[in-house]
Amino acid sequence: MRGVRGVRAGALLVGLALAAAACGGGNDNGTGTGSGGNGNGGGSGSAGGGGSTETKKVGVVYDIGGRGDQSFNDSAAAGLEAAKKELGSKLEVKELEPNADGSNRKELMDSLADDGYGLIIGVGFLFSEDIAKSAKESTDTTFAVVDGFDTLCTQPNSNLICLGFKEQEGSFLVGAAAALKTKTNTVGFVGGLEGDLIKKFQAGYEAGVKYEAGQKGKKIKVLVDYAGNTPEAFRNPAKGKELALKQIGQGADVIYHASGGTGAGVIAACASKSKYAIGVDSDQSLTASPAERKWILTSMLKRVDNAVHQTIKSYVDGTAKGGVQTFGLKEGGIDYAQNQYNKQLLGDIPTTLDQLKQQIAGGEIKVPDKPQA
């Protein structure tokens, strides 16, 4: 069974192929790059890729901003690069990015399915509903969505995988770091789109601040602001800078952002006022300018790269399974950043954070995933 889309598209394939040859190439309906071999690599009816030696075709559709966002998309891209390095000629890869308003996400995924890409990864929760529809239409294709809604991935033997993270656990760690670093006993949190996902970051951060403040016998205030209620809230550095400057004016000397590209403004604001920023998703010290880098205390590492890498690898070796897959501290999906740039800033803070990691992974500390009253 080729699936609804495969049947619908099948009658057109010969004509389209001839037309594409005459025109000198196809149309991605978005920004795209391709690499790798030239096999078919279609999956079977379940999530597994079959484990054969043929080249497997893997498509990745980034969210708006694509590669170069120094955050979420770049972390996914790093996972793809790791998979390409490990699997080499076993992979043929194509990368796409939606248009400015994201309205063609499903169109891009469907085009990859029609072109025989056996695994298609959508980067970000905004893909969730579209990718669920595509999975129902293209039953021979395996789909995976980073931060996908769990309610869409209830069938463990389906062709849809939701890759989830315990963001609250890593946010707890950087919250503890903020509590240990603050001199004003006021810290800040700047979120992107206000919703359940980013509330997990807020919840963990507030819990970490509160826990470590309690250990030190202090009371620390957490200021909270969100950049908006639309996807634009993840790509508005000017708004991020405005909110961070407001919090600094209210006494915050450490600010954690969970706001994608908007966070560039948060980091810039902190650096301009000699206050500390905490990055998110990837190690933002590694991509920041030298002037800003020295004010990035750490970053909450959401190992999207590991999740993407593992998903591609399991697809290629035929062990991928549909359903929800969750990555926390215990699974290597969450951490905090330590590097040559922030070693001096952190001082002995890692000693405390590493102890907390063990306590969280072992279940001794339960981190809330919703803000507490």
What are these regions (language model features)?
Residues 19-22:
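C-terminal motif of bacterial Sec signal peptides marking the signal peptidase cleavage site
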Residues 1-11:
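Bacterial N-terminal signal peptides that target proteins for export
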Residues 34-373:
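A residue-level marker of the well-folded mature domains of exported/periplasmic proteins
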Residues 24-27:
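Bacterial signal peptide processing site
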